[in-house]
From Swiss-Prot:
Keywords: Cobalamin biosynthesis, Glycosyltransferase, Transferase. PANTHER family: NICOTINATE-NUCLEOTIDE--DIMETHYLBENZIMIDAZOLE PHOSPHORIBOSYLTRANSFERASE. Catalyzes the synthesis of alpha-ribazole-5'-phosphate from nicotinate mononucleotide (NAMN) and 5,6-dimethylbenzimidazole (DMB). Gene3D superfamilies: 1.10.1610.10, 3.40.50.10210. Belongs to the CobT family. GO terms for biological process: cobalamin biosynthetic process. The keyword Cytoplasm does not apply. The lineage of its organism: Bacteria, Bacillati, Actinomycetota, Actinomycetes, Mycobacteriales. InterPro entries: Nict_dMeBzImd_PRibTrfase, Nict_dMeBzImd_PRibTrfase_bact, Nict_dMeBzImd_PRibTrfase_N, Nict_dMeBzImd_PRibTrfase_sf. It holds the Pfam family DBI_PRT. This is Nicotinate-nucleotide--dimethylbenzimidazole phosphoribosyltransferase. It comes from Mycobacterium avium (strain 104). It catalyses: 5,6-dimethylbenzimidazole + nicotinate beta-D-ribonucleotide = alpha-ribazole 5'-phosphate + nicotinate + H(+). Its EC number is 2.4.2.21. GO terms for molecular function: nicotinate-nucleotide-dimethylbenzimidazole phosphoribosyltransferase activity.
Length: 349
């Protein structure tokens, strides 16, 4: 599918936010990165001061990967379906962390190798499991288009329902292997640079994972620079849908927090699908996966947090949400020097 042109966040609102920051009762720049975030939020909303986020929404994209049968994960493939049920029951880490951050959670089954718990979760299902990318394409061309369209449709559904900030999450045994292929292909690095320990594999598991990425990358590099073909060859329905989701959020001028390796790999593809989309995103955190740092560098995104996390699900991004809300509060609720009757150092050189 083709995405509409992405327009950048409002530069006038950004300039107004930066100017307002300099009038607040604090030394200029004293709130550090919080000030930069507030300027970004004002630009995304097109107003200064910005509104507080009231309808943050996490969407977890779930799918199985045939490469999981190559011993690339510490967990068996059936865990994906089991975790989808856990999300639905409210018992996963993302449920707990999103709850304390004030965000609601939706899970979407794109390619879990099992029947979905209900029609709502499976409404966008493309297939049961994606292909083993070491020997075959992850998807057909038609499935790739369906997955991209599904991700874009989910973004539209959430924005139309009132979401004012989106958080992208993932679940899929083997998905960091596919993600490493996407990142290595788009940043032109070798597998050993992009592959991490994922769910906690040992050295032998890392070697198997690196070999799997090597084999898939050999095939994936043949289809570059076509981002849709790359998703077909090495992505999977969940990652393709994530790419569509991230791209369409930007088209809809809705700020989005990225999570870890799988999400950011998909976002890297999304930036190729919809140039300029990255201006609507923030990196919620930096995971311990080496490929994640590569993808963030390629997107020119600075992570908000670094807590040595590697779970996925949207957990790192959910933890960043209170900081984003704090940035809004500082810009919108602090008094100016004039309002507070405090001497402004800039007025007395």
């Amino acid at each position: 599918m083709e995405f509409a042109t992405v327009s950048p966040p409002d530069p006038g609102a950004a300039a107004a936010a930066r100017a307002r920051q300099d009038t607040l009762t604090k030394p200029r720049g004293a709130l550090g990165r919080l000030e930069d975030l507030s300027v970004w939020i004002a630009a995304c909303q097109g107003q200064c001061p910005p509104r507080q986020f009231e309808r943050a929404r996490v969407v977890v994209f779930a799918g199985d990967h045939g490469v999981a049968r190559c011993g690339v994960s510490a967990y068996p493939p059936e865990v994906t379906a089991q975790m989808v049920a856990n999300f639905d029951a409210g018992g996963a880490a993302i449920n707990a962390l999103a709850g304390v951050a004030g965000a609601s959670v939706r899970v979407a089954d794109l390619a879990v190798d099992a029947d979905p718990p209900d029609d709502r979760i499976g409404a966008n299902k493309v297939r049961r499991g994606s292909g083993d990318i070491t020997v075959q394409d992850a998807l057909t061309a038609e499935e790739t288009e369906r997955a991209l369209s599904a991700g874009a449709a989910i973004a539209d559904e959430e924005v139309d329902a009132g979401a004012d900030l989106l958080i992208a999450g993932d679940m899929g045994i083997g998905n960091t292997t596919a993600a490493a292929v996407l990142v290595a292909a788009l940043t032109n690095v070798e597998p050993v640079v992009a592959v991490g320990f994922g769910t906690g594999i040992d050295d032998a598991g890392w070697a198997r994972k690196t070999a799997a990425v090597r084999d898939a990358l050999f095939r994936a590099r043949r289809v570059l620079p076509d981002p849709v073909a790359l998703l077909r060859c090495a992505g999977g329905a969940d990652l393709a849908a994530l790419a569509g989701f991230c791209a369409q959020a930007a088209v809809r001028r809705t700020p989005l927090l990225l999570d870890g390796m799988a999400v950011t790999a998909a976002a890297l593809v999304a930036e190729h699908l919809a140039p300029g989309a990255r201006l609507w995103w923030q990196a919620g955190h930096r995971s311990t996966e080496p490929g994640h740092a590569l993808a963030l560098t390629a997107l020119d995104l600075e992570p908000i947090l670094d807590l040595r996390m590697r779970l996925g699900e949207g957990t790192g991004a959910a933890l960043a949400l209170p900081i984003v809300r704090a940035a809004v509060a500082a810009l919108s609720s602090m008094a100016t020097f004039a309002q507070a009757g405090v001497s402004d150092p800039s007025a007395h050189p």
